[in-house]
Regions:
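Active-site substrate-recognition segment that forms the wall
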Residues: 203-238, 248, 252-256, 277
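Conserved N-terminal glycine-rich FAD pyrophosphate-binding loop of Rossmann-like flavoproteins
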Residues: 42-58
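A short coil-to-beta-strand element that immediately follows conserved catalytic motifs
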Residues: 181-183, 200-204, 248, 260-276
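Tryptophan-rich aromatic "cage" segments
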Residues: 370-389
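Conserved N-terminal helical subregion
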Residues: 2-11, 53-192, 235-254, 384-389
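Residues at the starts of beta-strands that form the adenosine-phosphate
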Residues: 10, 33, 225-228
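Acidic/histidine metal-binding catalytic segments
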Residues: 71-72, 127, 256-274, 330-335
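Conserved mid-domain beta->alpha element of the FAD-binding
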Residues: 12-41, 160-161, 187, 217, ...
């Protein structure tokens, strides 16, 4: 339902990724005057998969893209956790129809590009401004001015920094702080499903856990592609870029001795990309006056729960609700947004970090106890265990 404001609250969003675009779509539908400013000269998303649980898919459905998600995504039937060497399934957690029945929305695996395009399509083109690299903010009390490298400047009632882990908006609010290298490097690849028919893969998310490493694979793009993520521990990341072109042979060497299915998926890739995984400690606050942060700009998390994008989507929906509640008091709205979202996102940051420890246990007594605990059901590692989401 749109608000009939005497003065339509204007909002500038810095960053045209999934979080920024979702925020724009939510706020535009609520009647706000929204513009997105993206530093890239064209909108695109890297070729990688993404998990969208029901906590996020229900929000995306309300934006009118349910049909696109069902057509381009995959609804996996389970989440399987396996041993690295023999492929033994330690735990199979149901997804699919069971999750949708329980939570009222589906669990999707998607190509990031498919989701990104779906969001771009629901935002009027005149609301997306490319080649705008944010450089400075000036808060005048009753409005905020954003300045850009190309010489442009814009004024708005509120400024949302959705510009990722290296957020310039965050830097402007809270000063410089380098993200921490976590000691993990991830190799990502996309493989045509046609190359893997001999493996008999099903629509199930698979995570293989091993000493100091783990390997994840699942279908995307209506089942035509298989996305894989291979994570291993490295002592340092010396390159300035946080993402580089990788080499398939390097991934094969890193996962030497792993199950044949893992190696077959890696071998089928034409190329891989290598990400250094960085994080930051949870912030004590996200907002200052008329400016706040969203997504990785304020709560970057390791991709070990599949909740990074989902939490940015939740941020977007909560931001819309808070601004709708206080449309004429932006400062109060952003303060409420922070109070509602910060504890939840910080909790998930910690849970993602803990999963790194659980996934990467060396073979030994602790690993045997973990496996026995999973097999016995003494600890619930299923999606239902995080129904609080």
């Amino acid at each position: 339902m749109q608000h009939d404001h005497a003065h339509r609250t204007s909002i500038a969003i810095i960053g045209g990724g999934i979080g920024g675009l979702t925020a724009a779509a939510c706020l535009l539908r609520a009647g706000f005057d929204v513009h997105v400013y993206e530093q890239a000269s064209r909108l695109s998303e890297v070729g990688a998969g993404i998990n969208i649980g029901p906590n996020a898919s229900r929000i995306l459905h309300r934006l009118g893209i349910a049909e696109v998600l069902r057509e381009t995504g995959v609804e996996p039937q389970s989440f399987d956790q396996r041993r690295w060497d023999n492929g033994h399934i330690l735990l199979r957690s149901p997804l699919g129809a069971e999750v949708e029945a329980a939570f009222g929305a589906p669990y999707y695996t998607l190509h990031r590009g498919d989701l990104h395009r779906a969001l771009v399509d629901v935002i009027p083109p005149d609301r997306l401004h490319l080649a705008h690299r944010f450089t400075q903010l000036l808060d005048y009390g009753d409005f905020v001015e954003s300045r850009f490298e190309n010489g442009a400047s814009v004024s708005a009632d509120a400024l949302i920094g959705a510009d990722g882990i290296h957020s310039v908006v965050r830097h402007a609010l809270f000063g410089p702080e380098k993200p921490r290298f976590t000691g993990c490097v991830t190799h990502r690849g996309i493989v045509s499903a046609d190359r893997l028919t001999h493996l008999g893969l099903e629509f199930r998310n698979q995570i293989w856990m091993g000493p100091g490493q783990h390997f994840v694979h699942y279908f995307v793009s209506a089942g035509t592609l298989v996305n894989f993520v291979a994570v291993n521990e490295e002592h340092s990341w010396l390159r300035e870029s946080w993402v580089d072109r990788g080499e398939v042979c390097d991934v094969l060497v890193a996962f030497r001795g792993w199950h044949d299915q893992v190696l077959s998926i890696i071998e089928a890739a034409d190329e891989t990309y290598k990400w250094a995984l960085f994080d930051r400690s949870p912030l004590a606050r996200w907002s200052v006056g008329r400016v706040t942060l969203l997504g990785d700009a304020c709560h970057p998390m390791l991709p070990f729960m599949g909740q990074g994008a989902a939490q940015a989507i939740e941020d977007a929906a909560t931001l819309k609700s808070c601004l709708s509640k206080f449309p004429s008091d932006v400062v109060a709205a952003l303060s409420l947004y922070e109070r509602l979202r910060l504890p939840r996102a910080s909790r998930l940051q910690g849970m993602s970090e803990n999963n790194k420890i659980r996934f990467h246990m060396p073979d030994g007594q602790a690993q045997k106890e973990r496996d026995a605990e999973m097999a016995s059901g003494a600890t619930d590692w299923s999606w239902a265990a995080i129904a609080w989401l």
